[in-house]
Amino acid sequence: MAWRGPSRLLEGVSDSIGVPLMQINVISAEILALIFAFAYRRYLCPMKVSVFTRQLSAASLGMCLLYFVYGSECIHVFIHAGLCYTALLLAPTSIIHILTFLIAMSYLMCIHLRRVLTADLEKYPLDVSGPLMLTTLKVTIVAFGLHDGFHRKPETLIENHKRHSLRRKPSTLEYFSYIFYFQSVVAGPPSFYCDYQDFVKGENIHLPVNPQSDMEINSNDRKDGDINTELEKNSKKIHRLPPSPIKPVCLKLCETLFWICVHVFIAPRFPALLNSDPVFIASHGVVYRMGYAVISMTCCKVKYYLIWTMGDAINNASGLGFNGFTPSGKPKWDLITNIKPFELERSTSAKMFIDNWNVQTVLWFRYICYTRIPFQRTLFTFILSALWHGCFPGYYFTFLSGAFMIQAARMVRRKVRPFFLKSTSLKKFYDFLTFLLTHMALAYTGVAFNVLYFNESMIFYNNMYWWLHIAGLVAMLFLTLLPAQPRQQDDKVTKNGHTLEKVKSS
């Protein structure tokens, strides 16, 4: 049976609990992926099966999950990836990054436009554009890595570009295994190509062969690992599984359950669409509505908290996401962590928010856009973000307003913040003030992202009197008259926990 839309297998469950079918499918697919992940690490680890088997099984499971969730609509993901791989094979590496980017974004924009024109958003709040967005990340990561590896000298590359540069084109299986691996194909978070290849080949953790390291590998590791001595001789490395992910997986699953409870029992009490409802607006003043916007936008973020936290747990359960050890020797499982909710909710600046929100996508924006654009980096990155998210007018309201707000915030930080560094109490007051303003600004700009449409966005901003846009503009005009403060005052702050690089980039 070919499905035009999502799988109908769980339609009865959807009708009985009143949750859209697509959301039921996605959660079910993530639960299946979690089960597959534990089995993948246990039975398909690098020391038991070949790289070929690991790649083929990961891609096959991912394709099955896609078909379960999206039915015949998943053909768009296959076509999208196939077109980009064809370009990768046929096009010269000197232009492969630009060509792949244009193909991937053009196809994605067509699907986004179709969603705007034809989709029933109430019945299908999710569609195949989600996996296509993830595929766009992955195919462009490979293409830009190839261009950097073939056409840029290593000494001219920044560290991030050098780390992800590629010196050969991936094989068909390597490419499509990366695109479709089951841990992240439905809802993310995605990984970079080199990180995935290290994982699938068993090279994401290794120890140098020397007496000291031999002592560090206990007898159980040697027995369970069954390490190939010839590989050990040739590579001078011992490859083994990362430390057990059970603890981080359990913690992330518990956190996921917490966010599910918030999403089910609290978030529905604060619908985002109420922000542009004429009756609600007529019944409440600006201050009340601004407070409601902050609460409702926080509730809107919860669905991302739960799906990305669960996605991180799925990756970790399979062994993907191990990121070395802390100085005290504890394993880190944050290589592809995509959301840090508690750090995010304590943000005192837009930069702190961005550093903890949709982390892997932000890294992608920096990798292919922000670090490569010679001017107006923030503006072009936010425009790309709007295009990548879709064609709804609300996205463009949000990201263009966000770019403007960030420029205003940077000027305030550069010229006003030094006056508050003269005492601890002033610094705390400044942090509290920026905490409030940051969360108001995020809610104010985020309403358009969630109401989606032009008229609804205009209703909200008109009845808010565009106050934050005006405040940002006035601040920028006024602060241009003030001289910049000596940079040494920022240096004092770096000694209390912020690096100089972060201060300069914020």
Regions found by a protein language model. Name each.
Residues M1-S506:
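Non-catalytic, membrane-anchoring transmembrane segments at the edges
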